[in-house]
Amino acid sequence: MEQRITVAIDGPAAAGKSTVAKMIANQLGFIYVDTGAMYRALTYQALQEGIDPKNEDSVLTILMNSNIELRQAENGQRVFVNNKDVSEEIRYPDVTSKVSFVAEHPSIRKEMVSRQQKLANNRSVVMDGRDIGTHVLPDAEVKIFLIASVEERAKRRHEENIKKGIPSDIKLLKKEISDRDEIDSNREVSPLIKAEDAIEVDTTSLSIAEVKDQILNEIFKYNTQNNKGV
C-alpha cells in the first residue's frame, strides 16, 4: 500500500455491507470499521443500564462515558464496550429492534461520526454503514452503495442468525427490515441516501464473491486512474 485509500460502503440493513467489507479489507490489508457495530454496542449498553433508547440525553450520557472499541482478531473484528466483549450480544433481536432509535439521535450521530473519522485518520480503511459516503467520509476515494430486495435481505439475516444460534423469525425480520428502512431513510440527521458519486450495486441475485469482485474492480480502477498502489 503506497498511499492512503478510503473505501465507503453504504446501504440498508442486511444488504451485505459488513460481510463484503471485511473480505475486501482482509484481501487488501486495510483496516475494517463496522460503524453499525458501534451503534449496536451503544444500544446494548443503554439496554443493560435500563435506559430508554428513545431518550437522547440519557443515551448520549452513556456514550460519553463508554469506551467502544473495534478490535481486530484472528476470527474477525470484535466489539468491546468498556473492555467487555459484546460481539455476540449486539446481534441479538432486542438490540436489533432498538438500534434505529439510538442511531437517529442528532447528538449521538455527531459524536459517532467524530469517532469514526478519527479511526480513519491516516489509514487505509474500508468503512461500512449508512452515511459513510455522505457524512463520515465524504471525500472517500471509492464509494459504493449496496441494495437488495427486502425479501432477500430478510433471508440473509435469518440464515445468519440461525448459524449464530440466535432466535430468528423470517416474517418478523421482513417487518423489522422494512421498518428500519423507513426510519433510516427519513431521519433528519444523516439519512440513508446514496452519495452522488457512489456506485450502486444490486446484490439481490449476486453471490458475496461477485459483489466483492465488483467492488475490488472499482478500487483497482481508481488506483489505475490515479496512480495509487494497493
UniProtKB/Swiss-Prot annotation:
It comes from the Bacteria. It catalyses: CMP + ATP = CDP + ADP; dCMP + ATP = dCDP + ADP. Its EC number is 2.7.4.25. InterPro entries: Cytidylate_kin (IPR003136), Cytidylate_kinase_dom (IPR011994), P-loop_NTPase (IPR027417). It holds the Pfam family Cytidylate_kin. Signal peptide: none annotated. GO terms for biological process: nucleobase-containing small molecule interconversion; pyrimidine nucleotide metabolic process. It is found in: Cytoplasm. One of its GO terms (molecular function) is CMP kinase activity. Gene3D superfamilies: P-loop containing nucleotide triphosphate hydrolases. Keywords: ATP-binding, Cytoplasm, Kinase, Nucleotide-binding, Transferase. Its main location: cytoplasm. One of its GO terms (cellular component) is cytosol. ATP binds at residues 11-19. Belongs to the cytidylate kinase family. Type 1 subfamily. This is Cytidylate kinase. The lineage of its organism: Bacteria, Bacillati, Bacillota, Bacilli, Bacillales. The gene is cmk.
